[in-house]
């Protein structure tokens, strides 16, 4: 288990994803990736469970800003099933995973499409700070590179 918390009598758990998990369709208009190649490297995956129901997924991978271990950060992402959006579970899950990842790195970051204002608010509620726009940073299924907004939390 990565994290667990009780909120208003409901239990939220973040745990590693297993191959037998029956995950909901948590895709959205922001997930139109196309048939592109997956980035090589280690990708960690987790599920968000509320009162026993899997409501979404999370992932994270290492980002290196220099050759030393101390220069490593984590980049994380989230997807929630539509019926669970707008209830605060995404912000809570991102805060919990961010707390967990900050135990092993000084920096945790997350980015989202410049037009995804809902996720930007969610990240801010989770304690992330807006750092700026990454121009043409992410290729999507429409064949265009999209701008992303970068958010981060640090230990200090």
Model-found features: residue ranges?
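Active-site rim helix/loop that mediates acceptor-substrate recognition in acyltransferases
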Residues: 26-51
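Acyl-donor (CoA/ACP) binding surface of acyl/acetyltransferases
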Residues: 1-21, 45-156
């Amino acid at each position: 288990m990565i994290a667990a918390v009780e909120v208003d009598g409901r239990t939220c758990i973040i745990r590693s994803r297993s191959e037998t998990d029956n995950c909901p369709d948590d895709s959205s208009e922001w997930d139109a990736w196309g048939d592109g190649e997956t980035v090589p490297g280690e990708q960690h995956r987790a599920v968000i469970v509320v009162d026993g129901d899997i409501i979404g997924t999370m992932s994270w991978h290492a980002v290196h800003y220099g050759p030393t271990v101390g220069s490593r950060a984590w980049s994380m992402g989230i997807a929630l099933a539509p019926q669970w959006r707008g209830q605060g579970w995404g912000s809570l899950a991102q805060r919990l995973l961010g707390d967990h990842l900050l135990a092993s790195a000084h920096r945790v970051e997350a980015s989202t499409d410049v037009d995804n204002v809902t996720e930007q608010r969610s990240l801010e509620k989770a304690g992330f700070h807006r750092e700026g726009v990454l121009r043409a940073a992410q290729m999507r299924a429409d064949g265009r590179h999209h701008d992303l907004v970068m958010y981060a939390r640090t230990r200090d």
